[in-house]
Amino acid sequence: MRGKVEPGSFGDFAESVMVSPVETVKPTDRLVYAMKKLVKKNIGCVVVVERKKPVGIITERDISRKVAKSTKVLMTQVKRVMSGPLVTVTPSTPIAKVLYLMLKHGIRRLPVIEKEELVGLVSERDLVRWVLQISYEPQIPVEIKQILAKRSEAKT
């Protein structure tokens, strides 16, 4: 189920844009299992969890890079391919900080954790949707404008 995204003040937090629940795999699962989940659920990533704690992430890009080298990699355990350590946020992390962390680390998705357990995921797509929904507001704070401008510059 998608997180409820409501336009409002820029005091919004990660929990207002995150997706929950999040598709997960275990470190010992085979890469082919993670790939099948991505295709079946039409999603761009799965979070790797161990005892409910997020320890890594597998994206479409991770899989395509590995499979391009050899299809034998599909039987490899997820832990050998996953990206980590993770940069994470909490449900109460301000959206401005979420944007900043994505830009700083060059990542597109941030797991949302509470008491070390995975509770959601914020993606660039979720943030774009949020920005579009609040775009009717007459003034976007300078902080958000600067972060979005830097993100746009980084892509060109």
Question: For each of these PLM feature ranges, what is it?
Answer:
Residues 1-156:
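Tandem CBS (Cystathionine beta-synthase) repeat/Bateman regulatory domains
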